[in-house]
Amino acid sequence: MIKDKESPIRSCHFVYIVALVFGTIIQFSDESEFVVDMSKTSLIHVPKDLPPKTKVLDLSQNNISELHLSDISFLSGLRVLRLSHNRIQGLDISIFKFNHDLEYLDLSHNQLQKISCHPITTTLKHLDLSFNDFDALPICKEFGNLTQLNFLGLSATKLQQLDLLPIAHLHLSCILLDLEDYMKENKKESLQILNTKKLHLVFHPNSFFSVQVDISANSLGCLQLTNIKLNDYNCQVLLKFLSGLTGGPTLLNFTLNHVETTWKCLVKVFQFLWPKPIEYLNIYNLTIVESIDEEVFTYYKTTLKALKIEHITNKVFIFSQTALYTVFSEMNILMLTISDTRFIHMLCPQEPSTFKFLNFTQNSFTDSVFQNCDTLARLETLILQKNELKDLFKTSLMTKDMLSLETLDVSWNSLEYDRSNGNCSWVGSIVVLNLSSNALTDSVFRCLPPRIKVLDLHNNRIRSIPKDVTGLETLQELNLASNSLAHLPGCGIFSSLSILIIEHNSISNPSADFFQSCQKIRSLKAGNNPFQCSCELRDFIQSVGQVSSDVVEGWPESYKCDYPESYKGTPLKDFQVSELSCNTALLIITIVVPGLVLAVAVTVLCIYLDLPWYLRMVCQWTQTRRRARNVPLEELQRTLQFHAFISYSEHDSAWVKNELIPNLEKEDIRICLHERNFVAGKSIVENIINCIEKSYKSIFVLSPNFVQSEWCHYELYFAHHNLFHEGSDNLILILLDPIPQYSIPSSYHKLRALMAQRTYLEWPKEKSKHGLFWANLRASINIKLMEKAAEIH
C-alpha cells in the first residue's frame, strides 16, 4: 500500500476545502499586500516582520516547532492561517484570541500531542487537526460555540463516544478522521459521528484492514475510505464495518482510495454494495493481488448509477481475461468508467445493456473493440481516449449498431483514414466527435458522421479542407487548432458553423471575406499563427474591427505579426500600412502621372532651348577626343601634313572662305584646299587622293549645291574608300543647309549611306551657338603634326 499522508482527501470534503482556501485567497489577491506566502522557506519560527494588514498567511512546510501569542496577535484582520507540515508539538488556543476574523486554520501534519483549551473566535469555518500525535480526540468544550464550522479534521489513537459530546449539536459539512495510528483494543467502541454530510476515514497504509469500533453518522451523504488493504480472510471485516455506514438512505456517494485487494474480495465488495442505496461508487488507485478467477456475480436490481475506477495495478500476470472483463461488461448500471488500467479489451455485453456512458480512457484497446456489438443500443457517450486505435474506418464500423450514440471521443490515438478501405459507416445519431491528437490528414473530411454538430480535429496533420466535401451542413463547432492549415477556411461547406478554432496553424494571410462567408459565426479563435503583415492582411484587420469584440477571441494579444522581421511581435491592431503602398491604381497615378508631366515639361524645355543640339555637339566632341587618343601619335605625325582637307561646292565658297577657314586656321590648324594645294600638272583625281591621304580629316560641306557637283562626288567617293581601306575615322560631315532626300540623285548612294549611318555637324543659324560649333569642329581635327611643308610635291 502507498501511504499518502500529503493528500488523503480525494473527494467529499476536498471540493469544500479547495473552494474555501482559494476562494479566500482570490478574494484578496487584488491587494497583494494582504497575502503572505512563506511556505517551503525552512522557517524555524514565525517571522516578526509580517505586514499588520495580512489576511492570508501561509507558513506550511517549514520547521516551526512553537507558536506564541506575540507571533500573530497583531494580525487582527487575519482570515486564513496555514501551518500544516511543521513540527509543532503543543497548541494554546489562546494565541488566536485577537484574531477575531479567523475563518480557516490548518494545523494538520504536525506533532501535536495536546491542546490547551480556551475560547476561540466563533467565525472559524475550517479547523484541521488531523495527522497529529493525539491520544484522544482533540475536542475542547469551547468548540461547541463554533456554529459556523463546516470542516473538522481530527486524529487520535483511541476513540471514545464522550469525546464528541461538546460538538454533538453542530451540523458539519465534512469530518476527516485520521485512524492511521489507531490502537486496536479488546473492547469494541461505538462511535456516533455527529451530523455530517461527508465523512472521510484514513487508515494505516501498510496494515490489513481491522477496526474495533462501530461508526455511524446521521444524514451521511458521502463516505470516503483511504488506505484499505484486504485479502480473502479479512474481507468480511470491511463488509461488516460498512454495514453500519451504508445502511442510511442518504448515503449516495462512496469512495475508496488506495485499495489493495484480491479479485475475489473486490467482487464481494461490489456484491455487498449492489443492493445498497449508493448511487456513485468511486475507486482510485486499485491494486489487484494473488489471483483472478471466475467469480459468481448476481446483478440485482440496483440504485447504483455510476462506477468509476481510475488506475488499476494488476499484479496477477496469468489469469482469465474473460473472468475479469465479464464482471464489468454485464453490469446493469448507467455509467461505467475504467481508466488508466491498461486493459487490452472489453467484452460486448451478452444481453441488451443499460449502459448510457462508457469511459475507457488510457487503456490498450485496439480496433477490434466492440466490433459487431449490437447490445449497446442505449449507449449515448463513448470515450476511448489514449488507446491503440489506428483505423478510422473500423472505428466507424464499431458505431453502426450503437443506435443512441451521440458523443464519441477517440482522441489521443493513432487513427488514420485510408479511402481505399471504402466509405465510413458511422451511426447517424452522432453529433459530437472528438478526433484530436491523431494522425489524420485532409481525407478525414470524407469520413465524418452525417449529422455531426461538434467536431474536434486539433493536433492532427491537416493541411487543407477539400472544397468538394459535402454533408457537413449541420456542423456548428469546428476545432482545427495545431494543424498545418495555410488558409482560413470559409463557410461554403459549413453553412451552420458558429464556432471555429484554428489557432496554432500556418495561416499567414487570412481572408478578409471570412466574416462575409460565415454569417453565423459567434466565436473565432485564430491567434498564434505566423501572420505576414502585408497589404492583404490589412483588409482582414479591418474586417475584425467591424465585428463584435466577443466574436474574435484572444484579440488583440494573440494576434501578432511574424513576418517581416521589422514587424515581428507587433500586434495586428497596431499594424499600419499606407493606402498608397496597397492601392496599385493609386500608386500608378501617384508615380506615373507626375513622371509623365515632368517628362513632357523637360521635353518642351529642351525643344525650346534646343538642348538636343547641344547634347549632340558634346557627344561628338567626346567621341572625337576618344578616337584620337586611340591612334598612335607617331603614326599620325609621320604621314600627315594637314589637319583637314575641305571639300565643298563653289556655290558655298563664300561661307567656306569667310567662316570656316578663318575660324579654323586662327588656331594654327593647317587646311588643305584644292585652289591652293593641288599640284599643277597632276590629274584632278590624283590631287584629290593625295590631299585626302595627307590630311588627318576630310571635311565635306553638305548642301543642295554639293550634290550637284560631280567633283564633290569624286572627293566623297575617295574619302569613303579611304575610310574602309585604312579602318580610320577621317570623315567629318557639315550640313550647311538641309538636303531633302528626294534631291539626292540615285547615283549618290554613298552620300545617302553616309548621311544615314554617320553623325554630322549641323551649322546652327543662331549666332549664339557658333562658338560651341567651332570648338567642337576644331577638337575633332586638332592634332600635332610634324614640321613639314604644307605643299604637296
From Swiss-Prot:
Occurrences of domain LRRCT (ranges): 520-575
Bilayer-crossing regions: 585-605
Regions of this protein lying in the Extracellular compartment: 24-584
Top-level taxonomic group: Eukaryota
UniProt membrane topology term: Single-pass type I membrane protein
Family annotation (Pfam families): LRR_8, LRRCT, TIR
GO cellular component: Golgi apparatus; membrane raft; phagocytic vesicle membrane; plasma membrane; Toll-like receptor 2-Toll-like receptor 6 protein complex
Glycosylation site residues: N63, N145, N253, N285, N359, N423, N434
Subcellular location: Cell membrane; Cytoplasmic vesicle, Phagosome membrane; Membrane raft; Golgi apparatus
Keywords noted in UniProt: Cell membrane, Cytoplasmic vesicle, Disulfide bond, Glycoprotein, Golgi apparatus, Immunity, Inflammatory response, Innate immunity, Leucine-rich repeat, Membrane, NAD, Receptor, Repeat, Signal, Transmembrane, Transmembrane helix
Segments on the Cytoplasmic side according to the record's topology features: 606-793
Result of changing D214N: In strain: Angus, Charolais, Holstein and Limousin
The keyword Cytoplasm is annotated on this UniProt entry: no
SS bond partners: C117-C140, C235-C265, C348-C373, C424-C447
Signal peptide (UniProt feature, chain positions): 1-23
Tissue specificity field: Highest expression levels seen in blood and lymph node, intermediate expression seen in spleen and lowest expression seen in the liver, lung and udder cistern.
GO molecular function, one term: lipopeptide binding
Boundaries of every TIR domain copy: 640-781
SMART domains (alphabetical): LRR_TYP, LRRCT, TIR
LRR repeats: 54-77, 78-101, 102-122, 123-147, 148-168, 169-196, 197-219, 220-250, 251-277, 278-303, 304-330, 331-354, 355-378, 379-404, 405-428, 429-449, 450-473, 474-495, 496-519
GO biological process: cellular response to diacyl bacterial lipopeptide; inflammatory response; innate immune response; positive regulation of interleukin-1 beta production; positive regulation of NLRP3 inflammasome complex assembly; toll-like receptor signaling pathway
Family: Belongs to the Toll-like receptor family.
Quaternary organization: Homodimer (via cytoplasmic TIR domain). Heterodimer with TLR2 via their respective extracellular domains. Binds MYD88 via their respective TIR domains. Interacts with CD36, following CD36 stimulation by oxLDL or amyloid-beta 42, and forms a heterodimer with TLR4. The trimeric complex is internalized and triggers inflammatory response. LYN kinase activity facilitates TLR4-TLR6 heterodimerization and signal initiation. The heterodimer TLR2:TLR6 interacts with CD14 and CD36 in response to triacylated lipopeptides.
Functional summary from the UniProt entry: Participates in the innate immune response to Gram-positive bacteria and fungi. Specifically recognizes diacylated and, to a lesser extent, triacylated lipopeptides. In response to diacylated lipopeptides, forms the activation cluster TLR2:TLR6:CD14:CD36, this cluster triggers signaling from the cell surface and subsequently is targeted to the Golgi in a lipid-raft dependent pathway. Acts via MYD88 and TRAF6, leading to NF-kappa-B activation, cytokine secretion and the inflammatory response.
Name this protein carries in UniProt: Toll-like receptor 6
Organism of origin: Bos taurus
